[in-house]
UniProtKB/Swiss-Prot annotation:
Its EC number is 2.7.7.8. It comes from the Bacteria. PROSITE patterns: KH_TYPE_1, S1. One of its GO terms (molecular function) is magnesium ion binding. This is Polyribonucleotide nucleotidyltransferase. Coiled coil: none annotated. One of its GO terms (cellular component) is cytosol.
Length: 732
């Protein structure tokens, strides 16, 4: 076993190898605090026939890592949760560009989180572990790389902040890089400036270099020879001939504004060229197909670099035409149809109650994690005119949805001010690049349409890069073709005041911060243009919620009244819900949330809650219901759960022989609360609300009257039933 330990970001960080998973091609354990991850990598001995590099990354959080047992009926880990898929994507996107071009042996990277201290996140540790395991194996890999998380707490930059620190941070970025450049960025923020993002990247790169130094020191002791492999190369004569015949024709085919016209023209041209070339080279069909693809790749790139114009005729910094429709779905709480060029998203916002929040088990928290905001992104095959199998939500859909969700998260109102669970669904109806950013724009508009008081509108734009040596071009609002044949996909979302979400993937070994600085500046200009177009359609949240959305109000009740509100076996709260149609939820701190479609039922439910939990006030008049009639009076419910004695002598100024001559069970009576004794028992009076007949002598209040010997007693001697406050609780 080999091991290295250093202090990183104020805590011990350990990398070790040779103790676990020794039959894998390479393995490593990384520990930070008491969080530990195991990475194990394997490789196929033979090249895959697939036209792409078959890399698989699996990231799994073991519940035993936090001393937990999985919830549900089946007590074992199942399919990956969203956050595990997102962590796997971060690792995949960071390491994929660093495998040699042409290497197509299948590689699998497995990450297990085997200890979780609920302070330090494991995803950046997993990136370090994967890098070390690959470098310590026979797999060719142009590393090492490392990843860090950066936050800013009260103006101070923090590397690998704890979960508690992240709760106070206005920025959270995961950054991966090599010694010389950045290879991946992912994160969100609260409207921070481009300058702040760049500063965080510089700080992150310093931490990355430190972690790479640790890896290199340990790799010097354990590195093994790399496996031999041969890059498939076409014969030189075929390569030259394909370039001669294809370059001009493919460039001409590429220059079509419409996506499908372009694709059809390029494919038709390639087919015609291939048929002619096969006459000359009948045994090299595969080489000819690959070389024609290479020509397409180089022609698109050289056109942009040579002419500064793109295949659809736009300039480098030009955004496609935008059209926006809002309120397109009459029953949805908020909706928008956002179209940019040939990319279109139908986005709907739904408002729900706290009961609609998502509750998740997590090894990062002692208890459940609750999500009251969700954005779900769907990318059906018809959006690109394709036919493909549907196998549930893809990793790409989860990743794009998370990016768009994070873009909007920072501008939502506080839950205390707007106590709704919010779900946004973005259905991509057409796609020709940047559908996730269309989802951001459509999501912001749908929330405005729903009347959600966002702090500001949010827009997003996808930036691209074409780089050949020292020449490069940064492209705004990239097409699908530019994404496929370019070197970078850099998505930036935010408001007019700052960035709220960012994601960068590259296909080359890395980018220096100078290019990223230019890309951020150009992205800001594009974002402001898009925000201007959105303002023309809907500049602010609508003043009222949809008539189909629930109205929610919160009231605070004393904690000791929670039991009375709920009632025996939930009787009281169910009664309110059944009578009003409202939905009630009660928190442990006495916060009661009332939700109803329609203001009348909500107000009625609110009054009933306040009636149950309010304290009767001596001297106030109440409308009550006679619950019981006895020989000495009646018991009247003046508030739900609060019954008080209406003594026979308090029914009329004149003498009443039989209480049932005045009131009957079920009667609604108006009474005045005249007394509450030291034991909390309540006494009512009807006659106090009636004019006193002339000449009638004053009587002492009942509390001062002597006990009678005819069996008639004051209500307080009935064991407390007549005067108790909160009788509903005593009955349970």
């Amino acid at each position: 076993m080999h091991r290295i330990e250093r202090t990183f970001a104020g805590r011990p960080l350990v990398i070790e190898t040779g103790r676990m998973a020794k039959q894998a091609a390479g393995s490593a354990v990384v520990q930070f605090g008491e969080t530990m991850v195991l990475a194990a990598v394997t490789v196929s001995e033979n090249q895959s026939p697939l036209p792409f590099f078959p890399l698989t990354v699996e990231y799994k959080e073991k519940t035993y890592a936090a001393g937990k047992i999985p919830g549900g009926f089946i007590k074992r880990e199942g399919r990956p949760h969203d956050h595990e898929i997102l962590a796997a994507r971060i690792i995949d996107r960071s390491i994929r560009p660093l495998f040699p071009e042409g290497f197509k042996n299948e590689v699998q990277v497995f990450i297990y989180v085997i200890s979780a201290d609920q302070e330090n996140d494991a995803d950046v540790l997993a990136l370090v572990a994967a890098s070390f395991a690959l470098n310590a194996s026979k797999i060719p890999f142009l590393g090492p790389i490392a990843g860090v998380r950066v936050g800013r707490v009260q103006g101070h930059w923090v590397l690998n902040p704890t979960f508690q620190q992240l709760g106070f941070s206005d920025l959270e970025l995961v950054v991966a890089g090599s010694k010389d450049s950045i290879v991946m960025v992912e994160g969100g923020s609260l409207e921070v400036s481009e300058e702040d993002v760049l500063e965080s990247l510089r700080l992150s790169h310093d931490g990355i270099r430190e972690l790479i130094g640790m890896q290199e020191e340990l790799l010097a002791k354990v590195r093994v020879p790399k496996m031999s492999w041969v890059k498939a190369e076409a014969p030189e004569g075929i390569t030259t001939r394909v370039k001669e015949l294809a370059s001009g024709r493919i460039r001409e085919a590429l220059n079509q504004k419409d996506k499908h016209t372009r694709i059809e023209a390029v494919e038709r041209t390639k087919k015609e060229l291939a048929e002619g070339l096969l006459v000359e080279f009948p045994d090299n069909a595969k080489d000819i197909g690959n070389l024609l693809g290479d020509v397409e790749y180089h022609e698109l790139r050289s056109q942009v670099l040579d002419t500064q114009l793109r295949v659809d005729g736009r300039k480098k910094d030009e955004v496609r035409a935008i059209s926006i429709d809002t309120s397109v779905l009459p029953r949805a709480h908020g909706s928008a149809l956002f179209t940019r060029g040939q990319t279109q998203a139908l986005v709907a916002a739904t408002l729900g109650t706290a009961k609609d929040a998502q509750r998740l088990d997590s090894i990062k928290e002692p208890g459940e994690v609750t999500r009251s905001f969700m954005l779900h992104y769907n990318f059906p095959p018809f959006s690109t005119g394709e036919v493909r199998p549907m196998r549930g939500t893809s990793r790409r859909e989860i990743g794009h949805g998370n990016l768009a969700e994070r873009a909007l998260q920072g501008v939502l109102p506080d839950f205390a001010d707007f106590p709704y669970t919010i779900r946004i669904v973005s259905d991509v109806l057409e796609s020709n690049g940047s559908s996730s950013m269309a989802s951001v724009c459509g999501g912001s508009l749908s929330l405005f349409d729903a009347g959600v008081p966002l702090k500001a509108a949010v827009a997003g734009v996808a930036m691209g890069l074409i780089k050949e040596g020292e020449r490069y071009a940064i492209l705004t609002d990239i097409l699908g073709t530019e994404d496929h044949l370019g070197d970078m996909d850099f998505k930036v979302a935010g408001t007019k005041d700052g960035i709220t979400s960012i994601q960068m993937d590259i296909k080359i070994e890395g980018l220096d911060i100078k290019i990223m600085e230019e890309a951020l500046s150009q992205a800001k200009a594009g974002r402001l243009h898009i925000l201007g177009e959105m303002d023309k359609a809907l500049a602010a949240p609508r003043e009222d919620l949809s008539k189909y959305a629930p109205r929610i109000v919160t009231v605070q009740i004393p904690v000791d009244k929670i039991g009375e509100l709920i009632g025996p076996k939930g009787k009281n709260i169910r009664g309110i819900q059944d009578e009003t149609g409202a939905e009630l939820s009660v928190e442990d701190d006495g916060t009661v949330t009332i939700a109803a479609v329609g203001g009348d039922s909500m107000e009625r439910a609110k009054q009933m809650v306040m009636a149950i939990t309010a304290e009767p006030v001596v001297g106030e008049t109440y409308e009550g219901t006679v619950k019981t009639v006895t020989a000495f009076g009646a018991f009247v419910e003046i508030m739900p759960g609060n019954e008080a004695l209406l003594h026979v002598s308090e029914m009329r100024w004149e003498r009443v022989e039989k209480p049932e001559d005045v009131v009957k069970k079920g009667d609604r009576v108006t009474v005045k609360l005249v007394d509450r004794d030291e034991r909390g028992r309540l006494r009512l009076s009807m006659k106090a609300l009636l004019p006193k007949p002339e000449g009638m002598p004053d009587e002492p209040p009942q509390s001062e009257r002597p006990r009678r010997d005819d069996g008639e007693r004051s209500g307080g001697d009935r064991g407390g039933r007549g005067g108790r406050n909160g009788g509903g609780r005593d009955r349970r």
